[in-house]
Amino acid sequence: MTMQHNVDNQLMSLGSYSPIEWLLEAGHLQYSDYEAWRMGEIDNLEKHIDSPTKELIKNLEQAERFCAKLGLIGETQDYRGWKQDNAFKELTLSQSPTLTKLLSKQWVRQDDIPQMDLFMDNPSVVTENKLIEALASRQWDDADKLVDQLYQQDANHAQLHGYEDLVSFGHHTEAPIDAEPQNQLETIDEERIGLEQEIIPLARQLLQQKSRDYLAPAWQRIAQSLEGQPYNIAYPQSHASYAWEQMQNWKAVKHSILSDDSYIHHGELLFRLSLAYHFLKEREQSVITLIQLIDLKANHADSELDDSLENFLNLYPDANFIASWQRFMDLEEEQPFIVFPGWILLNEVGLIHHIEPAQIKPIKNPSFHAAYELLVAKRDNNETEELEARKALKNINVLLLTLYLQIH
């Protein structure tokens, strides 16, 4: 995805563009590291950004040029701590002045910038901005006082009741979810639905770029309530990994899925695990997991592409995989989808050095196994087995053997 698309997506969903938000969305920055930085546990955010500095600066400058082209206004943001002992301390984004300047900008529409004289003359505007900061930093008691102050200053404020709801929900997230064991999943799912349908739209409307920080404790609360719960097809989004995904906490996503012995049988979990590996820079494991998903979801009866699998593939963010997928779809002679796993493996021959026997065992796809056996025989210089494996691959699909011969 280009930086232009990233800017467009943020403008559409949050009304402004923030480089920090892009880093989190793109997986270059783990939310747990960002949160630790805000809590004063990390002194320099750049150390935890998984992107080469030169490339990062290039991408951020490209985004700035596009923002300027759109007529957006860049405002410098002060990033301060979320704890009492660092609440007034300006946090360090980077040791590089150039990168600090780029990361500290938020780009907003001209119409969203309050006129300075109006801002200075209207105390309710000042209070509202303090309230937004208190909500983002999870200072619920301070937010309570600021809501009362806003009411005293402007009892008819259009968003007053919305802010009251956000403060009330913030207090609500401080207690664990109270659910009877026999109704646990149902109760947690009701919490999730309320969060997604009511709180998230309100938070994005009122807090915009700061909504992620406000919402994180709610998702963490749901995730922690679901830890150890196996996937339940009746409540597909009531799995800890789903809640962790909303926070872009990919380490926790990976852990919660691998801790569920049933994950290999569920497409949602396999795709989420593949994404987690991708954003954790474990590319080979990501592609292998995606092959497991393809094997699970592909319709072997008529060899056609399953609709839900196609949706997964269209959302998968790996550029090399997408290129292989596109080449397969663009072949002059249309091939049955059942041979796609073998096609992927032959386009990603390095995968054989990373595949564990336990990962192969659940895969039933004949084209994958034939391609794998051939690549292993070639790697081991076993000419007899390679010849037999070539015949086996040819019997499954001539095109796959042709592809193998092209790369060897």
Question: Could you describe each region identified by the protein language model?
Answer:
Residues 1-20, 25, 29-30, 35-50, ...:
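Positively charged, polyanion-binding regions of nucleic-acid-associated proteins
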Residues 135-144, 172-177, 192, 204-221, ...:
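Helix-turn-helix repeat elements of alpha-solenoid scaffolds
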Residues 120-127, 156-157, 191-200, 228-238, ...:
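Generic helix N-cap/helix-start motif at coil->alpha-helix transitions
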Residues 214-221, 226, 230-233, 242-246, ...:
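Eukaryotic alpha-helical solenoid repeat scaffolds
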Residues 123, 127-130, 161, 237, ...:
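TPR repeat positional signature
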Residues 133-134, 150, 167, 239-244, ...:
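Residue-level signature for tetratricopeptide repeat
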Residues 55-116:
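Phospho-regulated, low-complexity intrinsically disordered regions of nuclear gene-regulatory
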Residues 34, 140-177, 262-271:
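Short, charge-rich amphipathic alpha-helical segments embedded
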